[in-house]
Amino acid sequence: MIIRLSLFILGCISGCKSCNNLIINLICGAGGSCFPKDVKALIKTAAKNGYDMRVLNAVETVNEDQKNILFEKFKKHFGGNIRGKKVAIWGLAFKPETDDMREAPSLTLIDRLLKAGCKVCAYDPVAMGECKRRIGDVISYGKNMYDTVLDADAIFHVTEWKEFRMPSWGVIKKAMKENPVLIDGRNVFGASDLEGIDYLKIG
């Protein structure tokens, strides 16, 4: 009943012209200079005035949880045995059409992957310079989305750039190791599109 009601509400919001620019799909966490900072500021201001903003505290907690969910799905898929796995990351910026990586989900993901002993190769149309400035060469950088998947065990789709939407899955599967998996942080793809690549999505 709750799921049906949630889908009904989501459908109503989607059909509202004044709300059509809102991010209402499940995603791997929100970043940027506004949302995380504003939520933290509101919580802090409320606390100074004696208020416990439980809803905003929950929003902040859930957003951080979403940034970790891709890694957890990846780890579970491989039964916890992920040391030495090579992974591709598609997208570094917190959203398309920018190189802004403030509070970006990709940073949380990269940190956890490296600590787990994984090898990371990332590509973003415009944010790789910013990523190098932030974390240097602790990961490798691909020339394009196809370059990142060579001998990779998994792909993380993190930022919804248009150029990631219609890849040649046959070419990608041949370039990857056996039994590859795509972890889709934007719920853009469908399992039937991937030509034999395992598919994990948000939600």
Map each language-model feature to its residues.
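Structural/interface elements that position substrates and couple domains in central-metabolism enzymes
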Residues: M1, F8-G203
